Swiss-Prot record:
<keyword id="KW-0800">Toxin</keyword>
<comment type="similarity">
    <text>Belongs to the redulysin-like family.</text>
</comment>
<dbReference type="GO" id="GO:0090729">
    <property type="term" value="F:toxin activity"/>
</dbReference>
<dbReference type="GO" id="GO:0005576">
    <property type="term" value="C:extracellular region"/>
</dbReference>
<keyword id="KW-0964">Secreted</keyword>
<protein>
    <recommendedName>
        <fullName>Venom platylysin</fullName>
    </recommendedName>
</protein>
<comment type="function">
    <text>Probable insecticidal toxin that has been detected in a semi-pure insecticidal fraction.</text>
</comment>
Amino acid sequence: GKGLDWFKKQWGKLKNSFKKVGAKVKAAFNKGRDFLKKKGIKVDPLNCQGSKCRSCLIFTLKPKKFCVEYAFSASAITISLTKEKDDEAKVLLGPFTIKTGNIPQCSKLGSFIGELCLQGVEGRLKSSNGKPHVNLCVGLLLKKFGCGAKICVSYVDGKFSGSFKPKLFAGDEENGTIMEAGDKEDEGKVIDAVPE
């Protein structure tokens, strides 16, 4: 709607700018781009009930399915990760809470997934009528595959107002933050709270 268009313009202010990356990150980005090109991973839309949301990552080549549950609150996100197999869910990680803006928390999750890094990011805007508008995003990075997903929800005036389509990106982790690849192969940016 019209409100969303206004925010899309405003989000420009929350976007981090792209900068040149070193050889290690560039190699990870290229690996991630190849994996995404092969459609090696898909991410389900967020399914939210109140401020609890769930989304699944599907590895299409294997096939394997991992689901992530998020409970969002104003400044923190509680996350748990389950592996879905034969209609049975096995908890791999969590539930644990991450604060926005902290360095990524990385955990080794067995030989298939490898290392998973999670980072919370938040972006704050005032809406045209002065109400606080907050985007909360979780960056999930699969280091072994060089790619990740960004899952974002928004709060308006302290109330949960909805979720965005998850975004897949080629990425890596460097200097204590998750990096998102740009269009040029040697460019990346620190993950931001802009949903697309």
